[in-house]
Amino acid sequence: MKLTCVVIVAVLFLTACQLITADDSRSTQRHRALRSTTKLSMSTRCKPPGSKCSPSMRDCCTTCISYTKRCRKYYN
């Protein structure tokens, strides 16, 4: 019985600590997660938006527009 009470109190204490630290860390993140297109462009060599491209080569950081044969621009 005593062991059960100790375990319950420990779990409640740890949960409270996590909630307190989660509240403190709001809006203090220095390096926000990058968008997946930005990650892709940073990890691979690809052509920037507006460059000439080939739809079959997949050489753009974004996508290749087939009728203009240019890499699509980023949208915010």
Swiss-Prot record:
Transmembrane segments: none annotated. Keywords: Calcium channel impairing toxin, Disulfide bond, Hydroxylation, Ion channel impairing toxin, Knottin, Neurotoxin, Secreted, Signal, Toxin, Voltage-gated calcium channel impairing toxin. The modification Hydroxyproline is found at P49, P55. PROSITE patterns: OMEGA_CONOTOXIN. It is found in: Secreted. Pfam families: Conotoxin. GO terms for molecular function: calcium channel regulator activity; ion channel inhibitor activity; toxin activity. The keyword Signal applies. Expressed by the venom duct. Residues 23-45 form a propeptide. The keyword Signal applies. Disulfide bonds join C46-C61, C53-C64, C60-C71. GO terms for cellular component: extracellular region. C.moncuri is a vermivorous cone snail. The presence of a 'disulfide through disulfide knot' structurally defines this protein as a knottin. The cysteine framework is VI/VII (C-C-CC-C-C). Belongs to the conotoxin O1 superfamily. This is Omega-conotoxin MoVIA. It comes from Conus moncuri.
